[in-house]
Amino acid sequence: MAALVQRIRARAASLPTFDIPFLLILLLLLSYGLIMLFSAGYAVALYRRGDAYTYIRPQLLFAALGVLAMYAASLVDYHVWHRLAWPMLGISLLLLTIVLFMPEYNGCKRWIVLPGLGTLQPSEIAKFSIVLVFSHIISLNHDRMKSFSTGVVPFALILGVVTVLMLLEPHLSGTLLILSIGAVLMFVGGTGLQWFGLAGGLGAAAIAAAVIALPELVPYATDRLASWRDPFADPLGEGHQTIQSLYAIASGGLAGLGLGNSRQKYLYVPEPQNDFIFSILCEELGFIGAALVVALFLLLLLRGMSIAVRARDKFGALLVVGFVVQVTLQAILNMAVVTNTIPNTGISLPFFSSGGTSLLMLLGEMGIVLSVSRQTDMA
C-alpha cells in the first residue's frame, strides 16, 4: 500500500505544473460565457431555426474541443512555434485571399464555408499567426530592434499585407485589432520610440485619406459613422441596433432583471448571441454582472503579464503578452461598441459571443500561455 501511495505521489510530481490562477480565471470566463450565450441566444435561435439550442449546442462542442486543444498545447514545448511561425503566416495569407471569393454576408466576406462543418473565419487565424511571427522575429533580433531595418521594416511589410487583405473583406475592427497587437509587441520587443512617432504620423495621414475615400471604398461605414454620432437620427435603420443595445444596458440597473429575463433579446437587439451579447448581460445581470466580466478580463491580463515577466526567454514572454493583450483589447473594443463609445465595427466578445473558430483559437492560444507558465522561473 505504501509503495502504491509513493508511486502515485511520484506520478503527480512528474505532471506539468500550470499557472493555476490563470487557468481558474480562464475557466470562469469560459463558463460565464457559455451560460450567457444560452441565455442571450435561445430566443432568436427558437425564432430563426425552431431550436433553442441552435447556438449553444455547437458552442459547447467547440468549447470541449478547445479545452482539449488547450491541454494539448500546454503540454507541448512552446519553442516548437518558432518553426511553425512562418508556415502559419503563409496559411493565414492564403485563407485571407480565399475568403475574398466567398459569398457576401451583411455586405462582408469574412467567412469560408466548410460544407458539413460550418464556417471558418480567417481573421482569427491571422491574429494567431501575427503573434507567432512577431514573437519569432523579435526574439531572434532583440538586440537590433532599435534600427529601422530590423525593428520596423519586416513588421510593417507583414502588417501591410495582412491589413490590406482584411480591409478588402472589409473587416475594419479586425484590422484595428491586428494593428494594435502588432504595435504592442513591437513596443515590448524594443522597437525604437522614434519609429512609433513616425508610424503615428503616417497612421494619421492614412486615417485622413481613408475618411476622404470612405464613401467609395466602404459605403456602409459612412452610415455607421453617422449612426454613431446620432443613432436616434435613424432609429429604424442604422441606429436601431445601437438604440436597442443602450435600452438593454439601461434596463439592467445595478443588479439586472435576472438571468434569462431579458426583454431586449426577443428580436429587439439584433445578434444578441454575437457582437451584442454584452448588452444582454448588462440587462440580465446589471452593473454587478458587467463589472464581474470586466474584472475577469483584467485579472486574465494581469496574471498573463505575471507569467510573461517570469518567462525563461523573450520568445515565451512575447507569446504571452501577445495573446493576453489580444483578448483584452478585443473585449475592450466590443464593450466600447455595445455602449456606443466607438462606431459599430462588428467585433465579438471573447469567450462569450457565438463562434466556433474564435473559441477554438482562443483556447488554443491560452494553452500556449499555460505552456509558457510551466517553464517559468518559479514553476
Label every PLM stretch briefly.
Residues 2-29, 35-170, 335-350, 354, ...:
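Membrane-helix boundary/helix-loop-helix interface segments in multi-pass membrane proteins
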Residues 26-30, 66, 92, 158-162, ...:
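Alpha-helical transmembrane segments of integral membrane proteins
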Residues 68, 76, 133, 208, ...:
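Transmembrane alpha-helix boundary/anchor motif
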Residues 86-93, 149-167, 172-213:
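Hydrophobic alpha-helical segments of polytopic membrane proteins
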Residues 105-111, 119, 198-292, 312-319:
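Hydrophobic, glycine- and aromatic-enriched re-entrant/interface helices and adjoining loop segments
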Residues 124, 132, 150-155, 178, ...:
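Alpha-helical transmembrane segments of multi-pass membrane proteins, especially transporters
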Residues 138, 176-195, 263-289, 348-363:
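Interfacial segments of multi-pass membrane proteins
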Residues 287-331:
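Hydrophobic transmembrane alpha-helices and their immediate junctions
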